[in-house]
Swiss-Prot record:
Identification of the protein by name: Aspartate carbamoyltransferase catalytic subunit
UniProt-annotated binding residues for carbamoyl phosphate: R97, T98, R147, H177, Q180, G307, P308
Native organism: Psychrobacter cryohalolentis (strain ATCC BAA-1226 / DSM 17306 / VKM B-2378 / K5)
GO aspect biological process, one term: amino acid metabolic process
KW Lyase (keyword) present: no
Described function: Catalyzes the condensation of carbamoyl phosphate and aspartate to form carbamoyl aspartate and inorganic phosphate, the committed step in the de novo pyrimidine nucleotide biosynthesis pathway.
Catalytic activity: carbamoyl phosphate + L-aspartate = N-carbamoyl-L-aspartate + phosphate + H(+)
Enzyme Commission code: 2.1.3.2
Annotated spans, Disordered: 1-21
Family: Belongs to the aspartate/ornithine carbamoyltransferase superfamily. ATCase family.
């Protein structure tokens, strides 16, 4: 199969086809065709499937929309922009932060919220994903928020199954986690002392299996960050990552020196088929975010982590709970970003339908 998927061929592709791709190449096969199904002809968002294919102005519009949900004191506000609409959360993978913040965001927007119990759904009885979605669509859903272990699942839904329902990607396999990427951008926008164009960002951890890393790198580059550094053992780096314009380090101390932002990543043990690390203690010794390593960064550097954290493996507790950590702010910002994406996607979907599509 070629290194890109023509959107015209997508109706014959299922999530199981995407899932067999290696994490070294999955992004190449999906990203080229992401922009077409998720945007209206005027550039407005009607699905949110990935950051790839969106330009700087579109990402800035999402950030600005998220900012509008904070009051003058920095507190989140309610705004009934989805009153009368129904959102269904379809999480085929376990989640705490993402699912909960989506639900909070939906309720703050005034939506009717339904959490589908996948473990008790008909998919566990052999029903196909396509049939499950068509049945849920018949129940007058307006938005599906989906997390799935198959890379490309959200794209599959938006193009083949339910094009008239706004699809929000809550994470798909190895491929992408776009709302996490955008909440990270909102956090940097709100907390960093310099604009994106002047920042040096270090991303540390399991890059190879991380959908967060893929979304963060894409968003950072689109927003103008020129100095993006990645650091991991060779076994946790995707092949050819250098072609994405990032600087690759194996020495953690060198990677974080004079940087403005340190992003830690979780070791994706559930996605690793065979042991790729000698031990957790060995990993922490060479790649853990410790006070000593944070001290090598700029004095006002931010420390970030998408969670869940493995303390004493990826990050020291004193750093996670320290003054430079913005990890809990990331969680709060996640509500605002998800409110923004839900609102913008529904607005775009309404415009798409009004145009007679």
């Amino acid at each position: 199969m070629s290194n890109s998927i023509d959107s015209q061929s997508l109706p014959t592709v299922s999530p199981t086809d995407y899932a067999r791709f290696d994490p070294d190449t999955i992004h190449e096969k999906l990203d080229a065709s992401l922009s077409r199904p998720q945007l209206n002809t005027d550039g407005s968002i009607r699905h949110f499937l990935g950051i790839e294919g969106l330009n700087k102005a579109q990402l800035q519009a999402i950030i600005a929309k998220a900012e509008s949900f904070f009051d003058d004191k920095g507190q989140l506000i309610n705004r009934p922009e989805l009153e009368g609409y129904t959102v269904m959360n379809l999480f085929f993978e376990p989640s705490t932060r993402t699912r909960t913040t989506f639900e909070v965001a939906e309720k703050r927007l005034g939506a009717n919220v339904l959490n589908i119990d996948i473990e008790r759904s008909s998919t566990k009885k052999g029903e196909s994903l396509r049939d499950t979605l068509w049945n849920l669509q018949a129940m007058t859903a307006d938005i599906f928020v989906v997390r799935h272990s198959a890379s490309g699942a959200a794209h599959f839904m938006a193009t083949e199954v339910t094009p008239d329902i706004a699809i929000i990607n809550g994470g798909d396999g190895w491929h992408a986690h776009p709302t996490q990427g955008m909440l990270d951008m909102l956090t940097i926008h709100r907390e960093a002392p310099r604009p994106f164009e002047e920042l040096s960002v270090a991303i540390v951890g399991d890059i190879k299996h991380s959908r967060v890393a893929r979304s963060d790198i894409s968003a950072l580059q689109t927003l103008g960050v020129k100095d993006i550094r990645v650091c991991a053992p060779r076994t946790l780096l995707p092949k050819g990552i250098e072609r994405f314009g990032v600087q690759v380090y194996e020495n953690m101390n060198e990677c974080v020196t004079d940087c403005d932002v340190i992003m830690g990543l979780r070791i994706q043990n559930e996605r690793i088929g065979s042991p790729l690390l000698a031990s957790s203690s060995e990993y922490y010794k060479h790649y853990g975010i410790t006070p000593e390593r944070v001290a090598l960064a700029k004095p006002d550097a931010l420390v970030m982590h998408p969670g869940p954290m493995n303390r004493g493996v990826e990050i020291a507790s004193s750093v996670a709970d320290g003054a430079q950590s913005v990890i809990l702010k990331q969680v709060n910002n996640g509500i605002a970003i998800r409110m923004a994406v839900l609102s913008l996607a529904m607005e775009g979907q309404r415009a798409h339908q009004a145009a007679g599509h």
